[in-house]
């Protein structure tokens, strides 16, 4: 077999050996449900709490603003669909860019079928969102701006801080798909004016099937997946402890 030369890390990455070793005990030794109340479950809960704290510290968030999901696409869907549902009484207009990931673009297409209006802002020759066009697109009924932090195909890093500032000056929520940037460039949700952020484990040498959603306190979006009371009643389903750690 010829030696593999892998050049697709923007799509997915190899799980680091040390990550795999950290995961293994939670498959066969500490396999308890972290939501349970017996003592064996406390070990799983401690591992989840530790991981939640690590993620929060990485982006300067509070631990209770971090939610674990099934991946970046789920987080993107949650941000857009739940915001649309929660803030529809204020307006049905959302702004995004023409070069977002399909998890955003296809969700926007879904929302258009539900009666929402989407404005797709253009980018310049370097792939950066045109800030003047973005600000001009804001209307009284705009409820959300969603612009990715870094593009998954051309690598352009967007002026997230400025986009967030513009959003907040107009009383609009700001979500960023940071799947391609999380763990690679510094992210500070306060300094960058971010209300919601999506991230994924398999882009940073972790396993597939685990994602993160940051939701700033005060953002009034509700459950996206219904069922149990996991993730402070906002995201149902038994937690994927091996993936989370």
How would you label these PLM feature ranges?
Residues 1-245:
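Pyridoxal 5′-phosphate
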